[in-house]
């Protein structure tokens, strides 16, 4: 589902199908990062930044415990990695994939990086940025949510079940 997208035909085009398949493949890469976080005892959230040609130019997973840094969220690490790769602070033609809806802090950073797209898996009803305001993101950033949502949600649920 996309926000504020122009009216489209109810019948998916081949471009829509290709984009969905690509989104799922790239969300699987973010899930690999989330699994790495889980293995490190971190909340399992993962993120990847993808260039317009489909190359992954930034990866990140939560490292708040290991780094003892409350800002070491998957998105922040992936964005910083991509900026280093490009040698630029703006990611205007890139797409950020993240397994869980970003928090307000990460949404603010995403706004300043200005990616073309933000794609997330599962919604975060407690601390996701949309609980505060959808206006945090840059107005030109296209948002898609719900990609592999069940897989993303299950990884989080399993992590918290294992910790109890």
Q: How would you describe each model-predicted region?
A:
Residues 1-40, 56, 102-164:
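Zinc-dependent deaminase
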Residues 30, 37, 74, 78-82:
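Stable alpha-helical structural segments in soluble proteins, enriched in small hydrophobic residues
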Residues 41-45, 92:
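Short, basic and Ser/Thr-rich N-terminal targeting/leader segments
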Residues 45-54:
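Short beta-strand scaffold segments in enzyme catalytic cores
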Residues 58-60:
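Short hydrophobic alpha-helix segments
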Residues 66-76:
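A short, polar/charged loop-to-alpha-helix boundary motif
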Residues 88-101:
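Immediate flanking context of iron-sulfur cluster ligation sites
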